[in-house]
Structures are given as structure tokens and as C-alpha cells.
Amino acid sequence: MEPSRAPVLGRLLPPLLLLLLPLYPRTRAKYVRGNLSSKEDWVFLTRFCFLSDYGRLDFRFRYPEAKCCQNILLYFDDPSQWPAVYKARDKDCLAKESVIRPENNQVINLTTQYAWSGCQVVSEEGTRYLSCSSGRSFRSVRERWWYIALSKCGGDGLQLEYEMVLTNGKSFWTRHFSADEFGILETDVTFLLIFTLIFVLSCYFGYLLKGRQLLHTTYKMFMAAAGVEVLSLLFFCIYWGQYATDGIGNGSVKILAKLLFSSSFLIFLLTLILLGKGFTVTRGRISHSGSVKLSVYMTLYTLTHVVLLIYEAEFFDPGQVLYTYESPAGYGLIGLQVAAYVWFCYAVLVSLRHYPEKQPFYVPFFAAYTLWFFAVPVMALIANFGIPKWAREKIVNGIQLGIHLYAHGVFLIMTRPSAANKNFPYHVRTSQIASAGVPGPGGSQSADKAFPQHVYGNVTFISDSVPNFTELFSIPPPTSSAGKQVEETAVAAAVAPRGRVVTMAEPGAASPPPPARFSKAVHSGWDGPTPSYQPLVPPEQRRGKPASPNTSACTQPGALHPRSEHPFPASAPRAAHRAPAGLRNPVSLPAQGLGHARHPAPLPHPAPTLDALRPAPFPLVPNGPAGAVLRVPSLSPCPEWLRNLDSRCSVISAPLTPFETSDPAGLRNTRDDRLDPARPSRTLRPSSHCLETDIVKLVSTLKPSLGFVTSDLCFVRPSECQGPSHGLWQKDVFSSCQNKEDSLSF
């Protein structure tokens, strides 16, 4: 499901690293040591940018006395000095020496006649050598580049062993650093800490996104770019720290740091292009042609970066102060950057055209990274032509790191998983990634290749430890452009429709008899089915018994049918009964309804009495396969620990023994449990005064006769429960009256 992420980076990096590590030129270190032998009469040695007052050169030269006499020439960066003589083919050795001002002590004569040179003759194995050890301080009106050359005009060539230490003051932060490198170590350490913080925050945000199944490939690539950036800065700090100590440093470490820096840039650039094309935002896969284009482009960009590093190490003239982009490879990188921006613009515009609802993300995303795309080439051009050479490296280093920090910081802010973040790009889970292809005919993407537009709408970020119930009840609107979803979890396609209870019997078991018809003796207009159950308590036991605290709703005098708003007339003897004073008051229900907002008009004919509605007994049939008892969710406000489809409504006539109940307010009778043949054993229920009834069977009894269906009736208001508070249990009791979707539909 993921595009090819420039595989050349992983395959080419190790061999390129081995190729580039030996290329670092040793002559650029500020501790310069070497053995020169040349047939020329004028040779460049090294350069250094000294401070205005604290620059110093300490040297030790040694050459055969037969090669006498040689001179050390000190040029500075004035146009009449070094630029006038370096690579000037029309000037010979004497002409190059003529631009030197002797009054400025710019010539060190390596002979015994020149006292300031510190030369003396030594003999080794029969050969006489001139050994010169001394130093020179540099003062100027500003920081200047100084260039050191060796000359012997009219001679037979040059031969010299040299060792030079060029310093700026005695501080650890300045001693071995050239003036144009001041502050680089401090800047790198500061940005290392900042990028480490960004990387840690990105890992934390990635952890949150993973918990919500929103950790997509593009965010992983951003995390990888930030991590590689941290490694790059770490190696830069190691190099500059060692350089500050001995003035040499480790060139291989610097090359490795540059490779990591370029890799971080390439990964982030690829991330931006992929996001512009809508990968993981509006599509789950880049088309084959798009993957090929990305692979070719990233391969070309990678090779250009490698060529730039090789060119800088091998072909940059140490006699000139050059910036990285002052080369054909550098200008090629600028061109590739501009091409990447054009591609980025086209991809973002296409994504916005097909998915306009993603404007809150793409508009600021496009505006922010337009500045970033232009910052790199503009910085290169300004560095090449607008920044003085004696301050270029430290300024460019700070600007370059600032550009990288801007890019990573903006991305981190725009993709933070916060409810207040209106620019969050991801709305499809990682477990619902769909294939996405190229736009179809007419520029529209095919329906089976793109993400459904806002499958989840606006993502609500809540605590990971709390389930997000809002998503359980949110149903996406049907759309013809919805892509094929691939779910990691089992799809609940075989589950019965919500709110419908499906019961099945074992094959071969006895089927329930057809519903009987009520006799029309009570009223000529009444005709309805006989309920599919028999009351457990005989009529003679129900009459004349006081109501217990757990009296069921369907046996109370004058109580409403649980699924009907029409009261049944109660007989006079039953209406006259009252609860004993020692027991709690039974639940009383209003005759007009159960707190429901809607009251349909009463039936045009009177309702029959309970005695007239009582059907003839017939065999009971279990509700589950092989006689098993099915558990169904209780719809009454008072939860039951065991509620079955064949539970009965009964009248409790006698108290229980103390050990059978834990209710401190009263005892409960379990006669209904003992008389229930379908209940395997007596099960204690939590004591409550709320109404309990078998809604499923009672509604199946009266539904055809009453001619209406109540699908979202909530039976009891919380105020009607008179039982004591039971903490969290009481919270669950009233939760069933708060969501209409929790009720059954018949």
C-alpha cells in the first residue's frame, strides 16, 4: 500500500559513504602539515580568516640548504592582492611578488639573514638543512582572508617540509576557527537541542496517532527526516568539537554529517510531494506512473547531491572561497528544486479540485511550503553573490538550519493530534486504507481508487483510555464515490439489524402454535393475538395479595402496558389492595403515560380486561437452539444480572429469607424463579423499585391488535426509581433512557 520511497537512498548510501569518506582534503585544516616538492616557482599553501586583532600564525619550515632561498608570501583578500595574482596566467613569479607590500611585513625570508624568520642551519646524515621556527601576528581593520604562498623566483623548483598553526585568540570557541566559522559550533549545538525536542514531540504525536490508527506513512517519513536531521547535527557537533580541540578534526565524520543532512532534506522533500499528491490524505496508493516519476526524480536528485559532494571534495579550488552551490552541481540542484515546486503546486491544485473539503489543510500547507521551496534557491543565490566571503559560512549555516527548522516546525504544528487543530490532514484510519489511482476520464478519480470523503468527519481527539462512543453511532452518508474499505476487524455484516431480537430453535424441535385470536365477546371491534407465554402465578394467587417492593409493572393495578399508552382497567378488588406499612411503597405509574413526550390518541373502542385477555395454556417453546436460554440486553432502566427472553412478570407475595437478598431496604421473593421452568437456577438480582417486564413477548402479544409500533419508547423516568443509590450501578440504570438508539425496534 505504500509507494516506493526512493529505494536508491537505502541501496546507494553505504557504498557512497565508503567512496566519499576518503575525499576530504587535509589541506583545509587549520593545523596544516605537509611535504611539498614541485618544479614550479610559486605555490599556494593554505588560507585562513583572521580576526582584526587576535590572529596569529605559528610555523616551522625545513628544507635543504641547497634549495635556498625560499620565501613565504602573505596575501590578503584586497582586490589588488590575492585576486590579482591567483591564477593570473599573464603574471610570472616576480610579478606576483611585486604586489606584496614590504612595509606590511608580508614577506618571510627563510634564510639566516632574516632574523624574524628564526632560521638556522642543521645537519642530518651529512645533509645540511635550514630549519625555521617562528610566528607572526595579524592585525587589520576587519576580519580578512589571508592566503599563504611559497615562492622561489628563478630557481630550480620548490621543496619544503612545513607545519603551521593558525589561530584566533585563545578561547576554545575561537582558537582554531577561522573568522568565517565563528559561532558554527554554538549554532549547531543549539539546533541539535531544538531538533531533538522536535523529534521527541513527533514521536509522542506518532504514539498518539498510532493509538487512533492515524499513524500514516507520510508522518512516519516526517519522523524519519527529523531523526536523520538530529543524527546529522550530532555528527556535525562531534566534528566541530574535535576541530576546536586540535584544529584538525575528522574529515570522514564531516562527510557523514553532510550525507545525513542531505538525506534528511530528500526524505522531507519526498514527504511534501506525496502529501501534495494526496497520499494518506485523500488516497491510499500512488498510481504506477506517479510512482515511476517519483522514483526517477528522487534518484536524479540523490545522484545530483552525491555529485555535488564529490565535486566539492575533489574539484573545489582551496585557493578560492567558494560556497557549496558555486558549482555546476549546485546550480543543477537549484533547478531540481524549482522543478519540485512546480510539481508540488500541480499536485496540490489537483487534490484541492477533487477534495475541496481538505482546504483547511492544503491552503496553509501550500502557503507555508511555498516559502520553503523558494528559500533554498534564494539562499543559495544570496550566499553566492550577496554575502561577504569572510562571513559567508557562518551566516549560511545559520540560515540553512533555520530553513530546516521552519519546515519541520510547521509540519509538526499542522499535524499535531489536537482537537483545536483545524488543519489536521488525516481522517481515514490506517486499517481502512484504500487503493487510489490516477484520475479517470474527465479528470475525476475513479470511485474505487480514492478515499471516501470524510469517512469519519472531523476526528475527535479524546483520551486513548476512553472509547470514543461518538464514532460507534455515527453512520457515514452513502456516496457513490466511496472507495472499497479494507477493515482489519471483522465486519458485522452478519449481525441482525439493530433493535431486532432474532431467536432460532433447534431443527426438529417443536414449533410454537400459531397465535390464537381473542374472542370478540368483550368488544366487537377488538381482535388481536394471544400472548405467547403463560403467567407463572395463577389468578387466585395474584388476587388479594399485597404488592411487594419488587412488584412487576405488568401486574400492578392500572399500570400501563410497557409498549402501549392505553391503560387496562383494573378490577375493583385489586385496586383496593394497598402495600403493608412494613414494606416500601410499590412503584406507582401515572395512568396517562410513562413520561413519554408523545401521547397518541386513544383507541376508539374500550380495551378488554386482563381476565378476558388471558389465553388458554399451551406448551412453552424455548427461545434458543436446543432449548438454550438466550440472554438479551435489558431495556428496563433497572439492569438485571440475568435476563432471558422467557422471563415472566409476576406478583411477589411473600418476603424472602434474609440470606437470599442483600438489599438493606427490603426482602425479595423468588417465586418467579422457582416457578420458571426455563430458568436453570435461582439467580439473585439487584434489588430495585424500577419496573421490570418482558418487553419482547408483551409487545409481540399486543402489536398486531393495537396496530402501532413503538420503537423508541423509554419506560421509566429516573425520578420513578425509588431505590437507594448504588454508585456506578445507578448510573447504568438511568443510561438506558438517554439514547433512543438503545431501545429495540419491533
From Swiss-Prot:
Glycans are attached at residues 35, 250, 458. Its main location: membrane. GO terms for cellular component: membrane. It is found in: Membrane. Residues 669-679 have a biased composition (Basic and acidic residues). InterPro entries: GPR180-like_N, GPR180/TMEM145, GPR180/TMEM145_TM. Coiled coil: none annotated. Residues 567-581 have a biased composition (Low complexity). The keyword Zinc does not apply. The chain crosses the membrane at residues 9-29, 189-209, 221-241, 255-275, 296-316, 332-352, 363-383, 395-415. Keywords: Glycoprotein, Membrane, Transmembrane, Transmembrane helix. Residues 505-604, 662-684 are annotated as: Disordered. GO terms for biological process: G protein-coupled receptor signaling pathway; response to pheromone. Pfam families: GPR180-TMEM145_TM (PF10192), TMEM145_N (PF21892). The keyword Protein biosynthesis does not apply. It is a multi-pass membrane protein. PANTHER family: INTIMAL THICKNESS RECEPTOR-RELATED (PTHR23252), TRANSMEMBRANE PROTEIN 145 (PTHR23252:SF24). This is Transmembrane protein 145. The lineage of its organism: Eukaryota, Metazoa, Chordata, Craniata, Vertebrata.
